[in-house]
From Swiss-Prot:
Gene3D superfamilies: Zinc/RING finger domain, C3HC4 (zinc finger). GO terms for molecular function: ubiquitin-protein transferase activity; zinc ion binding. It comes from Myxoma virus (strain Lausanne). This is E3 ubiquitin-protein ligase LAP. Coiled coil: none annotated. One of its GO terms (cellular component) is host cell membrane. It is an enzyme of class 2 (transferase). SUPFAM superfamilies: RING/U-box. It is a multi-pass membrane protein. The chain crosses the membrane at residues 94-114, 130-150. It catalyses: S-ubiquitinyl-[E2 ubiquitin-conjugating enzyme]-L-cysteine + [acceptor protein]-L-lysine = [E2 ubiquitin-conjugating enzyme]-L-cysteine + N(6)-ubiquitinyl-[acceptor protein]-L-lysine. InterPro entries: Znf_RING-CH, Znf_RING/FYVE/PHD. Belongs to the poxviridae LAP protein family.
Length: 206
């Protein structure tokens, strides 16, 4: 059974003692009243750590206040690279294929170049020019393929690095810069705030 929140329970901060103020996320005491959004009353009280953890669970959805809809003042920060968490799903299969292909083809080209003594055959005057062109093409082919696969592997590594860096991004919340604008809320904004709070539905125990 759901009941609509009674507006009489939404009080001003001036009417609440420091001992009664509690974070709306963890419900524990909070003696500091931050200025992260345009909310008023007890909906404004929240720990910085709790709010940041709540925002980082889904930045796209939680980047603004759910009640007053004012965007949070967020600042991006990356974790230390030694503390990064890597995810296998971000790694494309083509990266592993290209790395393996590069090593195999490059190794075959090196073995072919050394074992058959192609350099001596190319320098020999007994070999015709057509044969020399064929030998040069045959010796350079594996290295060209290896170079192309290496370029592709580098591109995949860059893509994987960017995806991993985004997953290890932390959004820190700071207090709003336009403090005076927040404090001077007109009557229309007050009505919208009341309507927003009235729409909150709290599940009551059966």
């Amino acid at each position: 059974m759901a009941t609509v929140v009674n507006m009489d329970t939404v009080v001003n901060l001036d009417d609440v003692s420091l001992a009664d103020k509690c974070c709306w996320i963890c419900k524990e005491a909070c003696d500091i009243v931050p200025n992260y959004c345009k909310c008023r009353g007890d909906n404004k009280i929240v720990h910085k750590e709790c709010l940041e953890e709540w925002i980082n669970t889904d930045v796209v959805k939680n980047k603004s206040c759910a009640i007053c809809e004012s965007p949070y003042n967020l600042k991006r920060r990356y974790k230390k690279i030694t503390k990064w968490r890597c995810y296998k799903r971000d790694c494309h299969d083509s990266l592993l294929v290209n790395m393996s292909l590069c090593l195999i083809v490059g190794g075959m080209g090196g073995y072919l170049l050394i074992s058959t003594e192609i350099v001596k055959l190319i320098a020999s005057e007994e070999v015709s020019n057509i044969a020399k062109v064929f030998l040069v093409s045959a010796s350079m082919g594996p290295f060209m393929v290896s170079a192309l696969t290496m370029v592709r592997a580098c591109i995949d590594c860059r893509t994987y690095f960017i995806a991993t860096r985004e997953r290890n991004t932390i959004h820190e919340v700071a207090e709003m810069e336009d403090v005076e604008e927040v404090e001077e809320v007109n009557d229309d904004d007050g009505d919208e705030y009341v309507d927003a709070v009235e729409e909150i539905v709290v599940e009551s125990p059966a």
